[in-house]
Regions:
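Bacterial N-terminal signal peptides that target proteins for export
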Residues: 1-7
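Bacterial N-terminal signal peptides
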Residues: 7-16
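Alpha-helical support elements that line or immediately flank enzyme active sites
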Residues: 63-79, 83-86, 251-252, 258, ...
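Helix-terminus loop motifs that line ligand-binding clefts
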Residues: 76-119, 349-367
Length: 402
């Protein structure tokens, strides 16, 4: 379907009955309104959520999540402004910068397919939620261009990683990060889960068989090639070499994906996420989940050696720290596999971590180039989104629905 033809379907989908209610009460026990809304900054004709105010750094994934929260709070105009801000940084080929520092995206493209998919997904929710809104044409254009980029970067039905590779240089002055221009050929399972739900949503709002077929092909390839029977979860990556890393998102989000395609392995993936990554943070007494089950903290041996003296543990299985964003993903997996009370309990266990503005921290421990303990847009938004799902009940899902 050509771009102009797809844009023409706006008039046809204006009457779509959405899955996201237009007006809802606060979606969390904690009022995060000040933090979420306070992160928005003017950008072009719209707004973007600033990830790191001190560094003036923006991440499009964070902005997409804030747009989803705004839709659930009944703040449709604010969600539309965020989509306008995201459209302002979208390239002609549909790519979006994973993150960038003001005043604008870097000259070297740093694109991650998962972030592109989340932006597209937020745009489709805007279209699906209500028939009105000033940014319908913009939202459809944003989503279609994002899909065009992703579908142009497929191998065997799966999307590849994106563009720009992070390189680290270690010398006497410390560690320096740079981005090397390149097209990434590796296949991230997480990115493909993101893309699946985006394409399914876009197929629904545009009534396009092409998007539905692309999503079906992706699901078939991912469920077949991505599953690790020996680990009870989806792998982190798919390629010629077996990926040894056990990543939480590929267990938790993997469970949500498998549940959506009615694959019985969803329950096993949830159990893996729940137990293999479980941790208690001794500094706060909070229980939750860590991002990786085992392996070195840094995969780059130079970074591992440089920071080994300052790390409390050399490996993830011995690191006692909680990742709120990831824990919320486990809660969603619990909900989608029939463990409603456990889903609620996982989120309740995170509440003591609330910081200024009732934000969740990124992590409960600082790890250079990986995690910090600053207020997290993504972590805060994920907790709110999953609380909203729990409040509605398992029979009325809104996030990542089939």
């Amino acid at each position: 379907m050509g771009l102009m033809r797809q844009l023409a379907v706006v008039a046809l989908i204006c009457q779509v009955v959405g899955c996201t209610p237009s007006h809802t009460p606060p979606i969390s026990a904690a009022d995060t309104e000040d933090f979420i809304a306070g992160a928005l900054r003017p950008w072009g004709a719209g707004r973007l959520a600033i990830t790191d105010p001190d560094a003036r750094r923006f991440a499009v994934y964070d902005s997409a999540l804030v747009a989803l929260v705004m839709l659930r709070r009944g703040r449709r105009d604010d969600a539309g402004l965020i989509l306008a801000g995201l459209a302002a940084v979208q390239a002609d080929d549909g790519a979006l910068p994973f993150s960038f520092t003001a005043p604008g995206p870097d000259k070297i493209r740093f694109v991650r397919s998962g972030a592109v998919a989340w932006v597209g997904y937020a745009a489709t929710e805007y279209l699906d939620a209500e028939s009105g809104g000033h940014e319908r044409a913009l939202a459809l254009r944003l989503a279609v261009k994002a899909a065009t980029y992703l579908l142009a970067h497929r191998v065997g039905g799966l999307v590849t990683g994106g563009e720009g590779d992070i390189r680290y240089e270690v010398d006497a002055r410390g560690v320096h990060e740079r981005i090397e221009p390149t097209t990434l050929e590796w296949i991230s399972v997480e990115h493909n889960i993101d893309t699946y739900f985006f394409l399914r949503a876009l197929a629904r709002v545009t009534e396009s068989p092409a998007y539905a077929e692309a999503a079906s092909q992706l699901a078939a390839a991912l469920s077949t090639r991505g599953w690790r029977e020996d680990r009870g979860q989806l792998a982190r990556g798919i390629g010629d070499v077996l990926d040894p890393v056990r990543a939480l998102d590929c267990a938790s989000w993997g469970a949500v994906f498998l549940a959506a395609i009615h694959d019985s392995r969803a329950s096993r993936a949830y159990e893996t996420a729940e137990h293999a990554y479980a941790v208690r943070d001794p500094r706060t007494g909070t229980s939750g989940h860590r991002p990786y089950a085992d392996g070195p903290i840094f995969e780059d041996p130079r970074l591992q050696q440089f920071y080994q003296a300052s790390l409390p543990s050399p490996s993830w299985d011995r690191l006692s720290a909680v990742w709120p964003e990831g824990s919320a993903g486990v809660a969603l997996a619990a909900l989608r596999t029939g463990h409603v009370e456990r889903a609620r309990a996982i989120l309740d266990q995170l509440e003591p971590l609330r910081m200024r503005g009732d934000a969740m921290p990124t992590f409960t421990l600082d790890i250079p180039f990986t995690f910090d303990t600053e207020p997290s847009i993504a972590g805060t938004a994920w907790v709110e989104l999953v609380r909203f799902e729990i409040a509605r009940g398992p029979d009325r899902p809104t996030l990542w629905v089939q």
